[in-house]
């Protein structure tokens, strides 16, 4: 299975780019707005290969980070969400912000994405909310009190909304004891630690 491809972003179109890999030109469906910043430049693209609906053609979907690709794959596990709609969602909402919105249960925000109604938005939140909350924050131990667990969750979501990477957040939250701190002080401490990474 191909994990990623390094090549030059040769051309940018509405919902895909052409990537030049050793003079082999690959069509990659993606968030073309993000990829347009790298037109003419060499870039590593994390890919996911999928057969189209007719099973007649293998399509390549590309992302700038491994985390965004993983979220793309998770979205497709939701009933009624295929590759095209999953990409549409990630092209409309930054993947880190999308994690926050799903974790918060923000149906209204998801409904704003073209092609998503209330039913699909609700299903996405129902099926992914707990999974994302567990995966994109430090896991609690058996002795951790519920209040501390919730506090770490809120700190994680706050830092995600500020644009910090998930791996960095987990590193900081697992290296400090936040149990005696208020939410505000916890966020301040986390930001201080993140500035040193």
From Swiss-Prot:
Annotated region (Domain III), positions in chain:
152-197
Residues covered by region (Domain II): 65-143
- UniProt keyword list: Cytoplasm, DNA damage, DNA recombination, DNA repair, DNA-binding
Annotated segments matching region Domain I: 1-64
What are the recorded Gene Ontology BP terms?
A: DNA recombination; DNA repair
An annotated GO cellular component: cytoplasm
- Subunit relationships: Homotetramer. Forms an RuvA(8)-RuvB(12)-Holliday junction (HJ) complex. HJ DNA is sandwiched between 2 RuvA tetramers; dsDNA enters through RuvA and exits via RuvB. An RuvB hexamer assembles on each DNA strand where it exits the tetramer. Each RuvB hexamer is contacted by two RuvA subunits (via domain III) on 2 adjacent RuvB subunits; this complex drives branch migration. In the full resolvosome a probable DNA-RuvA(4)-RuvB(12)-RuvC(2) complex forms which resolves the HJ.
Domain remarks in the Swiss-Prot or TrEMBL record: Has three domains with a flexible linker between the domains II and III and assumes an 'L' shape. Domain III is highly mobile and contacts RuvB.
Q: What function is annotated for this protein?
A: The RuvA-RuvB-RuvC complex processes Holliday junction (HJ) DNA during genetic recombination and DNA repair, while the RuvA-RuvB complex plays an important role in the rescue of blocked DNA replication forks via replication fork reversal (RFR). RuvA specifically binds to HJ cruciform DNA, conferring on it an open structure. The RuvB hexamer acts as an ATP-dependent pump, pulling dsDNA into and through the RuvAB complex. HJ branch migration allows RuvC to scan DNA until it finds its consensus sequence, where it cleaves and resolves the cruciform DNA.
Question: Which family does the similarity line name?
Answer: Belongs to the RuvA family.
Q: What is this protein called?
A: Holliday junction branch migration complex subunit RuvA
Gene assigned in the entry: ruvA
């Amino acid at each position: 299975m191909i994990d990623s491809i390094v090549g030059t972003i040769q051309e940018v179109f509405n919902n895909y780019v052409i990537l030049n890999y050793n003079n082999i030109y690959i069509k990659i469906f993606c968030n073309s707005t993000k990829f347009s910043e790298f037109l003419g430049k060499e870039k590593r693209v994390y890919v996911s290969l999928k057969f189209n609906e007719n099973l007649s053609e293998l399509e390549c979907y590309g992302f700038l980070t491994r985390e965004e690709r993983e979220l793309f794959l998770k979205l497709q596990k939701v009933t009624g969400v295929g590759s095209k709609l999953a990409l549409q969602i990630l092209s409309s909402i930054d993947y880190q912000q999308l994690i926050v919105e799903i974790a918060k249960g923000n149906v209204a925000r998801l409904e704003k994405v073209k092609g998503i109604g209330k039913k699909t938005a609700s299903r996405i939140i129902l099926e992914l909310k707990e999974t994302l909350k567990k995966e994109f924050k430090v896991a609690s131990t058996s002795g951790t009190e519920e209040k501390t667990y919730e506090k770490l969750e809120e700190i994680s979501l706050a830092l995600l909304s500020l644009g910090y990477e998930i791996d960095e957040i987990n590193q900081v939250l697992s290296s400090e004891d936040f149990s005696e701190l208020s939410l505000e002080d916890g966020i301040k401490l986390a930001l201080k630690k993140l500035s040193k990474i």
